[in-house]
From Swiss-Prot:
Modified residues (N-acetylalanine): A2
Keyword annotations: Acetylation, Coiled coil, Initiation factor, Phosphoprotein, Protein biosynthesis, Repeat, Translation regulation, WD repeat
Species of the source: Homo sapiens
Pfam family, one: eIF2A
Similarity annotation: Belongs to the WD repeat EIF2A family.
Name by which UniProt lists this protein: Eukaryotic translation initiation factor 2A
Composition bias type Polar residues, residue spans: 517-528
Record-linked PANTHER family: EUKARYOTIC TRANSLATION INITIATION FACTOR 2A
Modified residues (Phosphothreonine): T5, T518
WD repeat feature ranges: 56-100, 101-159, 160-210, 211-264, 265-306, 307-348, 349-391
Basic and acidic residues compositional bias, start-end: 494-507
Length: 585
C-alpha cells in the first residue's frame, strides 16, 4: 500500500487549516478550518498521527487518522507544545507568572497523558529556553535541566527522580538519539580562568573521575550548540563567543569541534576565516556539511576523521539541509541573502538545480524526500507573505500568496517515521509544472550618460572558488596545499605573460619549440641544462617550500619567530629570482 500524502499545516491571520500535499494542494477535510487570529501554537506528533493546537482558550488534540477530537485542556496562555516520541505525553508551557503579594508562582509546565487526558506532573519552568523535557526514542528515559543539574526520569514516572548528573554548573545538555545504551552530552561554561568543556556520558554511569566517555575543553566559548549524529557515535560542537577580540567580526567568533564516544576529539579545520553559519549531519552519520567563512561563504563536506571530502566552493549561502534519505543536499542563502538555492546530488557530487526563493524565511524538506517547502513568514517579514512547494529539480509545483492585509505565521509538513517513503532515483530533468518559475529581475548598476555607449568593464570584489573534490587522488605525489596551488597558478600565469611579451618584442625570430613543462615537485630533473643554474633553482624551491610551511603554521594560529617572519617577507624576491632563472634572463 502506497503511503499517504503528507499534509501541510498553515497558521496565520486567516486562521488555522490544513492543505493536502503534492500533487493535489487542496484544503484538507482532516481538520476543519479554525478562523480568527487567536491560534498561538500548533504541532504534529513525531509520527504525524496526532495534531495539537492552542487557540487562546483551550489546547486540543485530534487524531489525524480518524479525524476525531481526543482531548481538550483549559490552558489559556499556552504558547509551546511538544509530543513525546511515542505519543504518550503532551508537554505544554505557559509564561511563568508570580502573584502580586510576592508568593511563588504556580507550575507552568504540564505533562499530560495523551491516552487518558490526566495531568501526570506539573513543574515550574521559568525560562522558555530549553523548556521541554528530552525523551529517549523509546521513552524509557526522560531528562530535564533543573538548577544546573540534569534530572532523569524512567518510564514516564515523573514523581521519582531515577538519577542525577551534577557538575559545577551545567548550562545545557543533549540526550542522544537511537536505542540503548543512552548517552548524554553536557556543556559547562568556563569560570574564574577555567576553560569551558563538553563531556559525553553513558547513562547511568556518572560517578567517578573516569566516568566520562569523552571530554573536550576550550577557552573561546560563551555558548555552544551540540549536534548528535543519528547513530549516537559522535557530537559536533559549535563553540561561540559573544565578542571577537581580534576585531574581525561584530558577531563574535566560532570554532567547530568533533567529539566521538570512543574518546577521540578534534578541532575541525575550516579553510576560510569567518563565522560558522550552519553545520548539519547526514542521516548516514558518516559525514557532515559545514557552511562557514566571510561572504561569499564556503561549504564543505567532512568525514569522521574531520578531513574534507568535497568542497562546494564559494557562494551566497548561510544554511544547509540534507534530504530525509541523505542523498540530496540543499545549500541556501536566506535571511539577508537573496534566497538562492543549490541542490546537489551528494552521491555523485553533481549540481541538480539552482532555483531562487526570494525573501524566504523558512525551509523544510517534505518527508518523501522529493519536495521542498519555502515560506515568507511574519514577524520576520510582514510583506509578501506566502509559501511555495518545489520539486528538487527546481520546478514550482504550488504557490500561495496571502492577501496584502494578512500575515502568514507558520507553515509545516506533517512528519512521518523513517522508512515510510522509500528513496527514489535522482533525476536531473526538471519536472513539468503549471506554475511558471519567476525569474528574479537582476538590478543593473547605474551608468552615467557619458559611459552608456562605452563597453562595460566587469570588476569583481572577490574571486569565486569553484567546487572541487577533496579526496586524495591515487598516486604517490603528495598534493600541494591550497596556498601552494594558488602561488603556483600565479607563477605560471606570470611566466606565460613574460614569454608572450618577449615573443611580441622579437617577431623576427623564428619561434623555438617550448620545452615540455615539468611538475613542480620533480626538482631533481634537469631544467636548464646548466648544473649551476639547476642547483640555484633547486635551492630556491626549497626556500619557497619552507616559506609555504611557515605560512600554513601562521594560518593555524602559531606564533612565529622574528627570523621566520623575515623569511616570509622574502617570498616575493625569491619568486622573482626563480622566474628570472627559469626564463633564462
Amino acid at each position: 500500500m502506497a503511503p499517504s500524502t503528507p499534509l501541510l499545516t498553515v497558521r496565520g491571520s486567516e486562521g488555522l487549516y490544513m492543505v493536502n500535499g503534492p500533487p493535489h494542494f487542496t484544503e484538507s477535510t482532516v481538520f476543519p478550518r479554525e478562523s480568527g487570529k487567536n491560534c498561538k501554537v500548533c504541532i504534529f506528533s513525531k509520527d504525524g498521527t496526532l495534531f495539537a493546537w492552542g487557540n487562546g482558550e483551550k489546547v486540543n488534540i485530534i487524531s489525524v487518522t480518524n479525524k476525531g477530537l481526543l482531548h481538550s485542556f483549559d490552558l489559556l496562555k499556552a504558547v509551546c507544545l511538544e509530543f513525546s516520541p511515542k505519543n504518550t505525553v503532551l508537554a505544554t508551557w505557559q509564561p511563568y507568572t508570580t502573584s502580586k503579594d510576592g508568593t511563588a508562582g504556580i507550575p507552568n509546565l504540564q505533562l499530560y497523558d495523551v491516552k487518558t487526558g490526566t495531568c501526570l506532573k506539573s513543574f515550574i519552568q521559568k525560562k522558555m529556553q530549553n523548556w521541554c523535557p528530552s525523551w529517549s526514542e523509546d521513552e524509557t528515559l526522560c531528562a530535564r535541566n533543573v538548577n544546573n543539574e540534569v534530572h532523569f526520569f524512567e518510564n514516564n514516572n515523573f514523581n521519582t527522580i531515577a538519577n542525577k548528573l551534577h557538575l559545577q554548573k551545567i548550562n545545557d545538555f543533549v540526550l542522544s538519539p537511537g536505542p540503548q545504551p543512552y548517552k548524554v552530552a553536557v556543556y559547562v561554561p568556563g569560570s574564574k580562568g577555567a576553560p569551558s568543556f563538553v563531556r559525553l556520558y553513558q547513562y547511568p554511569n556518572f560517578a567517578g573521575p573516569h566516568a566520562a566517555l569523552a571530554n573536550k575543553s576550550f577557552f573561546k566559548a560563551d555558548k555552544v550548540t551540540m549536534l548528535w549524529n543519528k547513530k549516537a557515535t559522535a557530537v559536533l560542537v559549535i563553540a561561540s563567543t559573544d565578542v571577537d577580540k581580534t576585531g574581525a567580526s561584530y558577531y563574535g567568533e566560532q570554532t567547530l569541534h568533533y567529539i566521538a564516544t570512543n574518546g577521540e576529539s578534534a578541532v575541525v579545520q575550516l579553510p576560510k576565516n569567518g563565522p560558522i553559519y550552519d553545520v548539519v549531519w547526514n542521516s548516514s552519520s558518516t559525514e557532515f556539511c559545514a557552511v562557514y567563512g566571510f561572504m561569499p561563504a564556503k561549504a564543505t563536506i567532512f568525514n569522521l576523521k574531520c578531513d574534507p571530502v568535497f568542497d562546494f566552493g564559494t557562494g551566497p549561502r548561510n544554511a544547509a539541509y540534507y534530504s530525509p534519505h541523505g542523498h540530496i543536499l540543499v545549500l541556501a542563502g536566506f535571511g539577508n541573502l537573496r534566497g538562492q538555492m543549490e541542490v546537489w546530488d551528494v552521491k555523485n557530487y553533481k549540481l541538480i538545480s539552482k532555483p531562487v526563493a526570494s525573501d524566504s524565511t523558512y525551509f523544510a524538506w517534505c518527508p518523501d524526500g522529493e519536495h521542498i517547502l519555502t515560506a515568507t513568514c511574519a514577524p520576520r517579514l510582514r510583506v509578501n507573505n506566502g509559501y511555495k512547494i518545489w520539486h528538487y529539480t527546481g520546478s514550482i509545483l504550488h504557490k500561495y500568496d496571502v492577501p496584502s492585509n494578512a500575515e502568514l505565521w507558520q507553515v509545516s509538513w506533517q512528519p512521518f517515521l523513517d522508512g515510510i517513503f522509500p528513496a527514489k532515483t535522482i533525476t536531473y530533468q526538471a519536472v513539468p509544472s503549471e506554475v511558471p518559475n519567476e525569474e528574479p529581475k537582476v538590478a543593473t548598476a547605474y551608468r552615467p550618460p557619458a559611459l552608456r555607449n562605452k563597453p562595460i568593464t566587469n570588476s569583481k570584489l572577490h574571486e569565486e572558488e569553484p567546487p572541487q573534490n577533496m579526496k586524495p587522488q591515487s598516486g604517490n605525489d603528495k598534493p600541494l596545499s591550497k596556498t601552494a596551488l594558488k602561488n603556483q597558478r600565479k607563477h605560471e600565469a606570470k611566466k606565460a605573460a613574460k614569454q608572450e611579451a618577449r615573443s611580441d618584442k622579437s617577431p623576427d625570430l623564428a619561434p623555438t619549440p617550448a620545452p615540455q613543462s615539468t611538475p613542480r615537485n620533480t626538482v631533481s630533473q634537469s631544467i636548464s641544462g646548466d648544473p649551476e643554474i639547476d642547483k640555484k633553482i633547486k635551492n630556491l624551491k626549497k626556500k619557497l617550500k619552507a616559506i609555504e610551511q611557515l605560512k600554513e603554521q601562521a594560518a593555524t594560529g602559531k606564533q612565529l619567530e622574528k627570523n621566520q617572519l623575515e623569511k616570509i617577507q622574502k617570498e616575493t624576491a625569491l619568486l622573482q629570482e626563480l622566474e628570472d632563472l627559469e626564463l633564462g634572463i
